[in-house]
């Protein structure tokens, strides 16, 4: 009934000390897959087609378009959005193109130093600006670390996407800081929950370690609402 990768992911969750709700939502998501897989493919293809007009070196987002569409539309008619780790603006472009937003704020370090040894690193910010230029009046960005952004931030948000530096301590800081500026009933989306060597899961300095730690510490203040093969979504139900 389930693939080998499903069992590897369950083992991964056990190893990373996931709370029960994470197991439950992942299992529920896999049970629904036969019934929604066509819609997943449709939304994935639609966004990939849209990206043909953009400049992207990678696309890790399109596979999750279905979940963003489903969960955001179910919870919000209009919302404010923050993302930590914008890369070339793939996820931000999806938000701006498909939803009614109050504000969209993007945070990334974007290595724009002309002395950078890697041309691709210097081009990411240029790609980000190019990819979002059609929405230039609807978004803002902060060029710097997430720690620097949160230190001076006084804004609140309804949806926050955490996809910054993947070392566990930094992921935890990003989630904790995001939580503090998240409105009640707001949603945090964490990328790369299943990350690294899923089969052997020997490393304990990954996003899942930080995510599970935060979920355990705040389990009475939040609700896990979705776990797919790459991302986890949870809602703030109280301060």
Residue ranges and their predicted role:
Residues 6, 57-59, 239:
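N-terminal compositionally biased, intrinsically disordered segments and leader/signal-like regions
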Residues 12-18, 59, 63, 167:
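Intrinsic-disorder/low-complexity, polar/charged segments
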Residues 7-11, 16, 36, 77, ...:
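Intrinsic structural disorder/low-complexity segments
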Residues 4, 9, 30, 42-45, ...:
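Arginine residue identity/basic-tract feature
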Residues 1-33:
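Boundary detector for helix-to-coil junctions that initiate low-complexity/charged tails
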Residues 24-77:
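Class I SAM-dependent methyltransferase Rossmann-like catalytic core
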Residues 50, 54-55, 65, 69-239:
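S-adenosylmethionine/decaboxylated-SAM
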